[in-house]
Design a protein with these regions (language model features):
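Helix-start/capping segments and mature chain N-termini
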Residues: 1-5, 27, 34-222
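FAD-binding glycine-rich core of flavoenzymes that anchor FAD
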Residues: 2-19
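Extended, Lys/Arg-enriched charged tracts that mediate electrostatic binding to polyanionic substrates
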Residues: 15-29
Length: 222
């Protein structure tokens, strides 16, 4: 009800140009009147709105992503599953290194074995491998994004086989080498649907779908 009222009051900010939207971000911050490390007992709830275009400068063109094999974003038992500011702070150093090398974002591996694909810094990730849509399972260190959920529901309703499971970086590499990785994309409230055209792992570059947007990715975006 608060959100509906807010948007109706600020509807002049809703953009109409193609590829634009009104970004809505609710958040909370603690405001207890003391210092120290403790659970928050009082918080302020805020909603901000902003007209936006594409999250990445590439727009709907495929982005380049670097797989991080040293730093970790989150571990099971922590806050990786939550929309928590600290999760983003933990990803900043690796993100800056990726940007220096010309990559838009970091694709994180699990925090224990550095073996399993988890998520990109600002979005969940999906792959089409030999006709099957594969996305990392929610194991407690991955954000259960609403856009991820929506993509899964849409794809299943249209007859696609969608698997939420562990996906190792080795399996992904084999699919790339064998030509079975047909396309890849990220999805999130800010990025919406963003095609991935290149992955870099340990300084080896892999091009996906010739660096072009895939059919499923385009369909979801449209």
């Amino acid at each position: 009800q608060i959100l509906d009222t807010f948007i109706s009051l600020e509807q002049d900010w809703v953009p109409s140009a193609e590829g634009t939207s009104l970004y809505i971000r609710p958040f909370m911050f603690g405001n207890d009147e003391n210092l120290g490390v403790h659970a928050v007992h009082h918080a302020t709830f805020v909603i901000i709105l902003s007209p936006v275009g594409s999250y990445y400068k590439e727009g709907i063109n495929p982005v380049k992503i670097m797989i991080e094999d040293k730093d970790v974003r989150a571990v099971r038992g922590g806050t990786g599953y939550a929309k928590c500011g600290g999760n983003y702070a933990a990803s900043n150093r690796a993100g800056e290194k990726a940007e220096e090398k010309g990559y838009s974002q970091v694709l994180w591996l699990d925090g224990v074995e550095r073996k399993y694909i988890e998520e990109v810094g600002a979005m969940n990730v999906m792959f089409k491998i030999d006709g099957e849509i594969v996305t990392p399972a929610l194991t407690g260190s991955i954000l259960p994004g609403i856009t991820r959920k929506s993509c899964i529901e849409v794809l299943k309703s249209e007859g696609y086989t969608v698997s939420e499971r562990l996906l190792s970086v080795d399996e992904l590499g084999e699919a790339l080498k064998n030509g079975k990785l047909e396309e890849a994309w990220g999805c999130g409230t800010a990025a919406v649907v963003s095609p991935i055209g290149e992955l870099c792992y340990k300084d080896v570059k892999y091009t996906i779908n010739g660096g072009k947007i895939g059919e499923v990715t385009q369909h979801l975006y449209d």
